[in-house]
């Protein structure tokens, strides 16, 4: 089965009117829309697979990488020999970097190829990876609001929707405290600050965070590859640490884990190489007795990749990150079966669900 075509499809889906957010790693304050990049791979036998690259400000760069660097290396190759092909692509392109938009683009093509292989086998991807759970726990991952009243409202809405674990992206203590006050003692809170602090600053802030009772503090240090600093903060603060979203290679995940830097490891399938690389992290983490909590702050094939891999390879404490955005539309419409803090693993062939063609037509941009 030969790869006949690769198409990168950028989407821009607006937030619903009245939605407010603060500036963050993904965009400016009151971001009007969220950008995604889907990748469609077609074979000579007519099978189609879908992948996703991490989006936001990187969409244009990732699309360029797909169109000009990756597609020419993949078209005409065997779609079923995924890992050999992706290794060849990485070796050919490594001089342009091992992370960033190029890695996002490689991730999208890899996910699409796994979708094709599952469809060819007429089996859900989780079965190809070893079987597993029919349902998974999920947590609501909120945007950054900064204003305590907005944080309270978002926390309240997520709890009313049935979530028992929430992720904040706040960096100011009043907003973080407001979230805990609104949530009460029985809701789990995690805090992702997106790498803002030195080790000294993080130690000072960690003292203030001890009363918040966080399930984990995520990516507190700049630079994100300061694994020794994370290990020191983990030891001195007593707060569980999570990281891995911005780790791109298997070697660096081993360094992260060997440093004793984390209580939870967070590979991101739409950033670090797709399913081929993601599935290697679970046994690596098991050696270190560390749960895998995939980063999946997206709602397309990258999310489904995280769901299938976690269903097959995760542990009882693994959870799915569910982006809690108020958008005009979603890539899969209402097809994903969710209820409160649970999500059903799609059981169709491959990733189990294809993107809604009406959404693609309505929100595609150039």
What is each PLM-predicted segment?
Residues 53, 99, 140-143, 168-170, ...:
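A cross-domain feature marking catalytic cores of carbohydrate-active enzymes
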Residues 1-48, 67, 156, 165:
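Non-catalytic terminal accessory/regulatory regions of metabolic enzymes
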Residues 42-120:
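Metal- or metallocofactor-binding catalytic centers and their adjacent structured scaffolds
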Residues 68, 207, 213, 221-243, ...:
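Shared catalytic-loop signature of beta/alpha-barrel
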Residues 3, 46, 70, 109, ...:
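Conserved, mostly hydrophobic/aromatic
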Residues 127-237:
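Metal-dependent enolase-superfamily TIM-barrel catalytic cores that perform enediolate-based chemistry
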Residues 2-18, 30-34, 109, 297-366:
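Flexible C-terminal active-site loop/helix
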Residues 2, 123-134, 343:
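N-terminal amphipathic alpha-helix/helix-capping segment at the start of soluble metabolic enzymes
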């Amino acid at each position: 089965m030969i790869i006949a075509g690769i198409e990168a499809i950028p989407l821009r889906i607006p937030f619903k009117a009245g939605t407010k957010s603060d500036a963050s790693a993904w965009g400016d304050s009151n971001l009007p829309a969220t950008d995604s990049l889907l990748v469609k791979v077609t074979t000579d036998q007519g099978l189609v697979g879908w992948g996703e690259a991490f989006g936001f400000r990187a969409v244009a760069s990732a699309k360029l990488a797909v169109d000009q660097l990756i597609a020419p290396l993949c078209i005409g190759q065997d779609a079923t020999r995924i890992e050999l092909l992706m290794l060849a692509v990485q070796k050919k392109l490594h001089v342009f970097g091992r992370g960033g938009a190029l890695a996002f683009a490689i991730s999208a093509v890899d996910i699409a190829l796994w979708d094709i292989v599952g469809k060819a086998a007429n089996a859900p991807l989780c079965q190809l990876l070893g079987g597993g759970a029919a349902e998974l726990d999920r947590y609501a991952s909120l945007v950054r609001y900064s204003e305590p009243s907005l944080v309270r409202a978002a926390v309240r809405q997520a709890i009313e929707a049935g979530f028992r674990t929430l992720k904040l992206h706040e960096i100011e203590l009043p907003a973080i405290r407001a979230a805990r006050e609104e949530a009460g003692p029985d809701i789990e809170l995690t805090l992702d600050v997106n790498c803002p602090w030195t080790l000294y600053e993080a130690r000072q802030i960690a003292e203030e965070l001890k009363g918040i009772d966080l399930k984990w503090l995520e990516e507190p240090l700049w630079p994100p590859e300061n694994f020794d600093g994370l290990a020191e903060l983990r030891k001195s603060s007593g707060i569980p640490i999570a990281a891995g979203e911005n780790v791109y290679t298997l070697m660096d995940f081993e360094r992260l884990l060997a440093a004793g830097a984390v209580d939870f490891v967070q590979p991101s399938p739409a950033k670090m190489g797709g399913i081929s690389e993601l599935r290697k992290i679970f046994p690596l983490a098991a050696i270190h007795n560390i749960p895998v909590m995939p980063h999946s702050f997206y709602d397309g094939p990258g999310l489904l990749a995280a769901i299938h891999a976690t269903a097959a390879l995760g542990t009882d404490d693994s959870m799915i990150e569910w982006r809690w955005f108020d958008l005009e539309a979603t890539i899969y419409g209402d097809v994903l079966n969710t209820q409160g803090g649970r999500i059903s693993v799609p059981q169709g062939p491959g990733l189990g669900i294809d993107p809604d063609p009406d959404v693609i037509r309505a929100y595609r941009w150039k």
